[in-house]
Amino acid sequence: MPPIALLSVSNKEGLIPLAKELSIEYGFEIISSGGTAKTLQQAGILVTPVAEYTGAPEILGGRVKTLHPKVHGGILAKKGDLFHQKDLKDQKIKAIDLVVVNLYPFQETIKKPNISWEEAIENIDIGGPAMVRAAAKNHESVSVLTRPEQYQPFLQALKKGTLSNEMRRELAKEAFEHTANYDNAISRWMKLNAEKKSSQWIESIPLKQTLRYGENPHQSASWYSHQDQGWGGAKQIQGKELSMNNLLDLEAALSTIREFGYDENLLATTSQKAAVVIKHTNPCGVATANSVSLALKKALDADRTSAFGGIVAVNSSIDLATASELKNLFLECVIAPNFENDAKLLLSEKKNLRLLEMNKYYIDQSERNNIRSILGGLLIQESDDELIDEKSWEVVTKKQPSSIEKKDLTFAWKVVKHIRSNAIAIASSGQTIGIGAGQMNRIGAAKIALETAGDKAKKAVLASDGFFPFDDTVRMAASHGITAIIQPGGSIKDNLSIEACNELNISMIFTGRRHFLH
């Protein structure tokens, strides 16, 4: 009796060569359903339609094709089990040796604009996952292929006679991963369209890359990413392989630069170009200007010592002038919406420098959750990426900030939310001039930021990610010449800070919004 292959695929890539080789070279009888059978018949390949084999027609508009004992009995029967073989014989069921199935394109369907609920639901495969799971369960007797990339290795194993149980077990593992990813895509889509939060967190993300190591050389690390979201859509156009530390810093850089708009067409839509320099996930320099090259220069000038070996992000296309500034620096990575051709050519001389293009589409498609692992579980929160709402701000001092101060306060507030707590940012003329990050007390963060700013702190503004528990930060700021402050407010001793500001002729804004970052 010839071996039997059941073929039912949505992705027809590689289908005809596979079926021809199975049929001609190895004598497989091919059973197939629907569009797959039609494709094979048009290619001149002998096929037994599923409906002909089972004696049951497709019903419910194609919703039921392969859900039949003659299909699932043939897949699930163990070859070495006499009782199973007797059942097959009694029921006139053929044992199936190979299942080649990939599923309805649900993930592709839900990417379409204005997709209806009904269309998405109709692209949820039922029979396909059932066959894949059945074959994977019975992998000692049945091989299962779920991706075109598996076809040639499988045929090579057939040719060499090396189709081992170990290979079938690996194919079974990949099959269960395939159906798990599929079910997760459906679950995620329904979750996004549901009003209530899910009682379980289910996520299935494919492996993109095994990294050289983690934060330190003795730690192993891997990178998992959706291909159509976030970093899965980033294009590395040159440079060494990304490390885990690179990715963490790039995430911090992208989160910060998005505060100022991020678009490859930004040159035509706004005059606010921005540049960010990141070191160990903290901004060490941020600036805005009328050109990307000037914004970059200002961001670097904020703290050139810390910028050494850092990550740079800009929010618009990198032109030749910007590339000329970058060429003279030692940096790990540069990320932008786009690199102009002459900029690419110039930077290609720095072969180790990693250049990445990130299209705004992939950022917008990302589900914005912040996930942290703890012992035995996960902590999941919404990402702190809401836009600034200045209407909710309140000037709580007698002195009002000037228009120039207000502009710098807004700038500093955008930056400070991306600095590790306790965080202080000092800014002047659209440029950070002092940053205090990750301190155990707020006055300590302010001291670092003010000392970094030096004489530039005179007539500058200060932003704090959390409230002032005492008036000591205000008084220290005043002693260095700070003229305006922005902070969340909310301390039971807010009045002390307000009184100190009034005494020292400093304006202060309460935003009503805290931005801790741990």
UniProtKB/Swiss-Prot annotation:
Reactions performed catalytically: (6R)-10-formyltetrahydrofolate + 5-amino-1-(5-phospho-beta-D-ribosyl)imidazole-4-carboxamide = 5-formamido-1-(5-phospho-D-ribosyl)imidazole-4-carboxamide + (6S)-5,6,7,8-tetrahydrofolate; IMP + H2O = 5-formamido-1-(5-phospho-D-ribosyl)imidazole-4-carboxamide
Entry coiled-coil feature ranges: none
Cellular component, GO, one term: cytosol
Gene3D superfamilies in UniProt: 3.40.140.20, Methylglyoxal synthase-like domain
InterPro entries membership: AICAR_Tfase_dup_dom_sf (IPR024051), Cytidine_deaminase-like (IPR016193), MGS-like_dom (IPR011607), MGS-like_dom_sf (IPR036914), PurH-like (IPR002695)
BP-aspect Gene Ontology terms: 'de novo' IMP biosynthetic process
Keywords per UniProt: Hydrolase, Multifunctional enzyme, Purine biosynthesis, Transferase
GO molecular function per UniProt: IMP cyclohydrolase activity; phosphoribosylaminoimidazolecarboxamide formyltransferase activity
Pfam family, one: AICARFT_IMPCHas
Pathway in which the depicted protein is active: Purine metabolism; IMP biosynthesis via de novo pathway; 5-formamido-1-(5-phospho-D-ribosyl)imidazole-4-carboxamide from 5-amino-1-(5-phospho-D-ribosyl)imidazole-4-carboxamide (10-formyl THF route): step 1/1; Purine metabolism; IMP biosynthesis via de novo pathway; IMP from 5-formamido-1-(5-phospho-D-ribosyl)imidazole-4-carboxamide: step 1/1
Domain MGS-like span(s) in chain numbering: 1-146
PROSITE patterns (UniProt xref): MGS
Entry's EC annotation: 2.1.2.3, 3.5.4.10
NCBIfam families: PRK00881.1, purH
Domain description: The IMP cyclohydrolase activity resides in the N-terminal region.
Family: Belongs to the PurH family.
Protein name: Bifunctional purine biosynthesis protein PurH
Native species: Prochlorococcus marinus (strain SARG / CCMP1375 / SS120)
